[in-house]
Amino acid sequence: MDSKLRHRIEDFYYLEAELLDERKLREWLALLTDDVRYWMPIRHNPLERPNDITDELSKPGEGYYFDDNMKSLKIRVERTYAKNAWAEVPPSRTRHLITNIRIKKDDGNEIAVHSNFLVYRTRMETDKDMFVGTRQDLLRRSNGSFKLAWRTIILDQAVLDAKNISVFF
């Protein structure tokens, strides 16, 4: 794959992480397409050895942590700014670490990209959470940059210890 393209995609992801960590969520929304799908399936531990990682994940319609489109993402973002949003008062402090960025397919208009993440969140005095996993994205070229058209977030954890999932990945 083209190293310049990979570098541009890395810069896009680093900008996204910066916006999320600085709580610039409205600006983050501008990085998404109007028809975005942003979802996190539930991971389970099958009794038999799975043939593929997808065998460990819920399928669409079977349950999920969230399955958002632009409308629901806007609602989630605006809720974080509300004074009565108990899940984010006081706001979370996050650090998004994005690694192992791999271009899987480039059809000229859309690019399939996989990346690994570690999202560290702290709240209050002692609340700490770590979310670790992989993201399967579809980026769409837009005005010399990219927009996120689809993101599947796959957590390594089958059981979440976090009190909520109010952060974005």
Model segments located where?
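A short, polar/proline- and glycine-enriched secondary-structure boundary/capping micro-motif
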Residues: 49-50, 123-127, 157-165
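A contiguous catalytic/ligand-binding core that recognizes phosphate-bearing ligands
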Residues: 94-97, 104-107, 120, 130-131, ...
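Beta-strand elements of well-folded, non-transmembrane domains
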Residues: 117-123, 141
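Short beta-strand segments enriched in hydrophobic/aromatic residues
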Residues: 32, 117-119, 152
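Short beta-strand edge/turn micro-motifs at domain boundaries
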Residues: 108-114, 132-164
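Hydrophobic pocket/interface hotspot
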Residues: 16, 28, 73, 113, ...
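Short, low-complexity N-terminal intrinsically disordered segments enriched in polar/charged residues
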Residues: 1-34, 46
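A solvent-exposed, acidic/Ser-Thr-rich amphipathic alpha-helical stretch
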Residues: 34-114
